[in-house]
């Protein structure tokens, strides 16, 4: 698991494990620790071990969630430029080896977001884009996403989220990456399917399904 040390005016919290990936989650953990200290100052009793257990045990589905290791399958509900950049930064920091294989992106987004900006940012880090809609009236269909995507990366248009997953899964080898992102709605629609399919594959000696994102970090 990732570790973080938090130093405050009252206490040093050394090497605490965090169950979530990313520097932004380390910052969130530090904020939680400071909140604990403020609560203690108000008279609440909170044991250090409880704080450590809480940070290590936290799980947040679809927030840089690792669902398989071979291929590496990541599910993240980044839906704006800032969260997309945080996802990319964490991906490169936590999985440096992912650059050796193909990097496949399943992308869908809401019409009220900066989808063109997101696509141009993400396209520089992936070798193929699978563009799709999802079951929500706010989504932009795949054809609309294609108009916003840069021409430098090959794109596959998929009629729905399930088709995008099946296309990407069929194209991916054991050393490749499949990343699903762009919308909370897309992540919510695909997550049950990914968990089911990858669990079935695990029973057949195929992709390795992980219980938590942090467990994938060596």
Describe every region a protein language model picked out.
Residues 4-128:
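Nucleotide phosphate-binding/pyrophosphate-handling subdomain across enzymes
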Residues 38, 80-218:
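ATP-dependent carboxylate-amine ligase
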């Amino acid at each position: 698991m990732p570790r973080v040390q938090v130093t405050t005016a009252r206490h040093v919290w050394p090497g605490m494990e965090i169950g979530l990936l990313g520097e932004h989650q380390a910052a969130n953990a530090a904020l939680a620790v400071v909140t604990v200290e403020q609560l203690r100052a108000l008279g609440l009793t909170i044991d250090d071990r409880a704080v450590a257990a809480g940070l290590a045990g936290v799980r947040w589905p679809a927030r840089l969630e690792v669902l398989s290791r071979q291929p590496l399958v990541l599910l993240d509900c980044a839906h704006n430029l800032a969260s997309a950049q945080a996802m990319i930064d964490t991906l490169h920091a936590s999985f440096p080896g992912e650059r050796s294989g193909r990097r496949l992106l399943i992308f869908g987004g809401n019409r009220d977001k900066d989808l063109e900006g997101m696509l141009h940012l993400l396209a520089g880090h992936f070798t193929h884009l699978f563009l799709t809609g999802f079951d929500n009236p706010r989504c932009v269909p795949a054809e609309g996403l294609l108009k916003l995507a840069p021409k430098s990366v090959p794109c596959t248009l998929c009629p729905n989220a399930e088709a995008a997953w099946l296309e990407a899964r069929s194209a991916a080898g054991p050393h490749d990456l499949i990343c699903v992102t762009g919308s909370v709605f897309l992540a919510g629609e695909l997550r049950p399917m990914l968990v089911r399919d990858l669990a079935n594959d695990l029973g057949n000696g195929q992709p390795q399904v992980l219980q938590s994102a942090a467990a994938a970090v060596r």
